[in-house]
Amino acid sequence: MNGRPRTVRKALVALGMLLALIGCDNQRIAELEEGVASEADVRARFGAPETVWDEPDGSRVFEYNRQPAGQRNYQITVGPDGRMTALRQVLNPANFAKIQPGMTAAQVRRLLGRPARTTPFALTRETHVDWRYLDGPNTAMVFSVVFGADDRVIRTASLPDPEANEH
């Protein structure tokens, strides 16, 4: 009984931090205009990217991941001229629909960013990889990709987030 108030307090602090992060992201996004903002502007607003992918055309894609606690992953493209050309939140149904059986784990990682959780199942020789996201304005969901022993997609599913505090 003594631990319950502490658990509730920790949950409220975590929720407050998450809401602050979302608000900060919205402010950062509002301050960046495609075709105008520079790489320096992006880094000033979002900090150092977690991952940088070099594209064949000379552009680079910066990943700003909000997993495991958040429900968004941002990918920001900076063109060869140093200007931001795209800012996308990649955890969405359109991107999930691109995940097809046979795709490699690396291809999925590149499309969706770092996941919230990876769970290997030795007996079935499968690995379940989960991304937390919002469906609509406030429905917490998990997009799960199941990989076989060869690290290729077997199947996908979207389910309600069991860790979400729905009231």
Residue positions per predicted region:
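Sec-dependent bacterial lipoprotein signal peptides
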Residues: 1-22
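Residues within mature, well-folded domains
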Residues: 24-167
